[in-house]
Structure formats: structure tokens, C-alpha cells
Amino acid sequence: MANLISFHDVAKHKCKNDCWILIHGKVYDISTFMDEHPGGDNVLLAVTGKDASIDFEDVNHSKDAKELMKKYCIGDVDQSTVPVTQQYIPPWEKESTAAETTKEESGKKLLIYLIPLLILGVAFALRFYNNK
């Protein structure tokens, strides 16, 4: 059985000489890798104390990088200790959501102008037919 590590314990290790990160439920002790990371140690330090899965996927790491990660894995995070965060939404879904919102807003704007015009039209029609 894999070593279960609480999120609180992972969050404690957040300095260059003692750095753990959480990616896809796995805990990695990357203290010895800090100087080797192509993006620099600041990039890694920026994702300590949180689930770094989204940040990791955004970079689109190579297969070699993902293979190298196995060397630094020290266990699995206890999922019951991980704070709830926002769910990852791929960029293409974000655009779709924004487009739907824009369509809804434009429909509402159209109604704002059409309803008064419709009321005005009915009022003129009633007045015209009542005068005859």
C-alpha cells in the first residue's frame, strides 16, 4: 500500500531545501530537483501548499519529464485532507461558456427594446380601432 500523506504535511514543505508538491494525488519530494528544473526553482516554489495539477498540465510537460517524476514520488495524498478547489475547465470550454453567456445577454437586451415597442404598437392599434 502506498504511503498516505496528509495535505497539511505536504503544505509544510515549501522551501528550496525541503520542497514537496502535489500533482494528481501523488506527493513528490523535489528538494534535490530544484536546481535542475528547466523553469527554475521559483516556478516550483510557487505551486507549493496547493494542488499543482492544473499548473502542471498547463505547461504540457514531455513524456520524459513525466517519467522522471516517478523518481521523486514519496506517496499518495490523503484525499480527505485536500481542501476543495475550483474544478479545472479547459480553455475551449471556457470560451463556449462565454459565448453562451453573450448569447443570453444579447437576447435579454433585445427583449428590453422589443417589449416597450410591442406595448406601444398595441396602444396605437387600440386607439386607431377605437376611433373608427
Swiss-Prot record:
Keywords: Electron transport, Endoplasmic reticulum, Heme, Iron, Membrane, Metal-binding, Transmembrane, Transmembrane helix, Transport. GO terms for cellular component: cytosol; endoplasmic reticulum membrane. InterPro entries: Cyt_B5-like_heme/steroid-bd (IPR001199), Cyt_B5-like_heme/steroid_sf (IPR036400), Cyt_B5_heme-BS (IPR018506), Cytochrome_b5 (IPR050668). It is a single-pass membrane protein. One of its GO terms (molecular function) is metal ion binding. Its main location: endoplasmic reticulum. This is Cytochrome B5 isoform C. Residues 2-78 form the Cytochrome b5 heme-binding domain. It comes from the Eukaryota. Interacts with CER1, BI-1, FAH1 and FAH2. It is found in: Endoplasmic reticulum membrane. Disulfide bonds: none annotated. The keyword Transport applies. Belongs to the cytochrome b5 family. Heme binds at H37, H61. Gene3D superfamilies: Cytochrome b5-like heme/steroid binding domain.
